[in-house]
């Protein structure tokens, strides 16, 4: 699948060894080094292409954009893979409700997402794979699990046998009752007759009338389950194990728990660290496609909002924070952008040295991607700007993705 253009990332001067980039691991509930090796590998779970791109999406992908920028500045080779779930129940339901062919809906929304990511200067994945593209690899993987006794059939469907994975449950660390409730709430079918365990997830859904299906070989015609898609796409894009799997906080369970389990059963390894972004609210409730309380990036931009203002508004909050969007966020971000732009044109000899901004922003991002602390460092300099303003311009560009 075609990605979007890569924004320029200017090189920054460095003296001394870079600090390790620490992130909050959702499994251990502690700060860990995101990628200790020379190559840093990241899989961020992508969109289901309807109602794209809302600010919840943008907030999540901004977190992993910052992570990549911190890695690149530390001299690492970054390999980033993501997906588009371009066939799934919610997409099919929306297409049916609106009378649009599901393929056209997916195509149009994916293109809108590309446009929004370009405007927000997000670094694109090296490989960006649609669920439909991944079907041959998913068929191979599910067939292998079935042959190994790690999966079983229920009528025309194939389910993972979670008892084959002793590590299941370690990613989220939830009790059985909580897992069952969340599984039912987030697309699972714990009450399906014939399953060995209520939490066993679908790997392959048999053909249904009026729904798209593909040749599954010995699996029969059908389409892939959600979790196996990401396991296979991450495996094929990064290899297993890899450094970081990321997404919104609502993906911790069941999606990341299940996809990690599938990866272990397929190749004996999975993500080493799981990182999750906080969820945004609007009008008093979490932004939700089902509720319809979404704020769309494209509509903000169409109304004349500078995309750097949108990016700054999101950066004003730590990526793990749960917060509510209001129009005040944009006004505050626009004032900040105006202040920074004015400051780079008005440096003076007794102002704060520009090098202090570079050091402070680096330190902030190395400490769990602390964007608010990074913005505060630039604010301090902008209040009394000194030194080479070009250093500040390059710093906020390379590390924060803000083009002044």
Swiss-Prot record:
Reaction(s) catalyzed by this protein? Answer: 1D-myo-inositol 2-amino-2-deoxy-alpha-D-glucopyranoside + L-cysteine + ATP = 1D-myo-inositol 2-(L-cysteinylamino)-2-deoxy-alpha-D-glucopyranoside + AMP + diphosphate + H(+)
- Quote the cofactor binding remark: Binds 1 zinc ion per subunit.
Query: What cofactor does this one take?
Result: Zn(2+)
GO cellular component entries: cytosol
Checking PANTHER family in the record gives: CYSTEINE--TRNA LIGASE, CYTOPLASMIC (PTHR10890:SF3), CYSTEINYL-TRNA SYNTHETASE (PTHR10890)
> Which molecular function terms from Gene Ontology are attached?
ATP binding; cysteine-glucosaminylinositol ligase activity; cysteine-tRNA ligase activity; zinc ion binding
Which positions does UniProt annotate for L-cysteinyl-5'-AMP binding? 45-48, 60, 83-85, 226, 248-250, 280
Tell me, in a sentence or two, what this protein's role is.
Answer: Catalyzes the ATP-dependent condensation of GlcN-Ins and L-cysteine to form L-Cys-GlcN-Ins.
Motif 'HIGH' region: where? 47-57
Species this protein is from: Xylanimonas cellulosilytica (strain DSM 15894 / JCM 12276 / CECT 5975 / KCTC 9989 / LMG 20990 / NBRC 107835 / XIL07)
Describe the protein's quaternary organization and the partners it interacts with.
Monomer.
Write out the ranges of the annotated region (Disordered): 1-20, 185-216
* Motif mapping: 'ERGGDP' region: 185-190
- Which BP terms in the Gene Ontology apply to this protein? cysteinyl-tRNA aminoacylation; mycothiol biosynthetic process
Q: Does the keyword ATP-binding apply?
A: yes
Question: Binding of Zn(2+): at which residues?
Answer: 45, 230, 255
> Which residues fall in a compositionally biased region of kind Basic and acidic residues?
186-199
According to its UniProt record, the EC number is 6.3.1.13
Keyword annotations from UniProtKB, A to Z: ATP-binding, Ligase, Metal-binding, Nucleotide-binding, Zinc
**Gene3D superfamilies (UniProt xref):** Anticodon-binding domain of a subclass of class I aminoacyl-tRNA synthetases, HUPs
The name under which this protein is listed is: L-cysteine:1D-myo-inositol 2-amino-2-deoxy-alpha-D-glucopyranoside ligase
Q: Which family does it belong to?
A: Belongs to the class-I aminoacyl-tRNA synthetase family. MshC subfamily.
């Amino acid at each position: 699948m075609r990605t979007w253009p890569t924004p320029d990332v200017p090189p920054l001067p460095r003296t001394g060894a870079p600090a390790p980039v620490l992130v909050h691991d959702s499994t251990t509930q502690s700060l860990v080094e995101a990628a200790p090796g020379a190559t840093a590998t990241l899989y961020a779970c992508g969109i289901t292409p309807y109602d794209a791109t809302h600010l919840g999406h943008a907030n999540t992908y901004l977190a992993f954009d910052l992570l990549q920028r911190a890695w690149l500045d530390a001299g690492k080779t970054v390999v980033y893979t993501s997906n588009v779930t371009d066939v799934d129940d919610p997409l099919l339901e929306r297409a049916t409700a609106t009378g649009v062919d599901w393929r056209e809906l997916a195509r149009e929304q994916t293109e809108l997402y590309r446009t929004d990511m370009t405007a927000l200067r997000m670094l694109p994945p090296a490989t960006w794979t649609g669920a439909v593209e991944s079907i041959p690899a998913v068929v191979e993987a599910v067939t292998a699990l079935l042959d190994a006794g790690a999966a079983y059939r229920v009528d025309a469907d194939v389910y993972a046998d979670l008892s084959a994975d002793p590590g299941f449950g370690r990613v989220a660390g939830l009790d059985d009752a909580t897992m069952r409730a969340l599984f039912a709430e987030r697309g699972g079918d714990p009450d399906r007759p014939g399953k060995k365990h209520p939490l066993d997830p679908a790997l392959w859904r048999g053909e249904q009338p009026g729904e798209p299906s593909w040749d599954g070989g010995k699996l029969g015609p059908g389409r892939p389950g959600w979790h196996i898609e990401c396991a296979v796409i991450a495996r094929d894009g990064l290899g297993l194990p890899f450094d970081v799997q990321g997404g919104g906080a609502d993906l911790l369970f069941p999606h990341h728990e299940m996809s990690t389990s599938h990866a272990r059963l397929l190749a004996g390894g999975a993500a080493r660290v799981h990182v999750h972004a906080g969820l945004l609210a609007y009008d008093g409730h979490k932004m939700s496609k089902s509720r319809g309380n979404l704020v769309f990036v494209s509509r903000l931009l169409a109304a004349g909002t500078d995309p750097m203002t949108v990016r700054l508004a999101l950066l004003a909050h730590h990526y793990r924070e749960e917060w509510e969007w209001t129009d005040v966020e944009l006004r505050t971000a626009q004032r900040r952008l105006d202040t920074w732009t004015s400051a780079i044109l008005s440096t003076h000899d007794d102002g704060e040295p520009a090098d202090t901004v570079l050091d402070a922003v680096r330190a902030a991002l190395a400490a769990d991607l602390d964007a608010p602390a990074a913005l505060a460092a630039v604010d301090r300099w902008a209040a009394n700007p000194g030194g080479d303003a070009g250093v500040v311009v390059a710093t906020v560009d390379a590390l924060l993705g803000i083009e002044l």
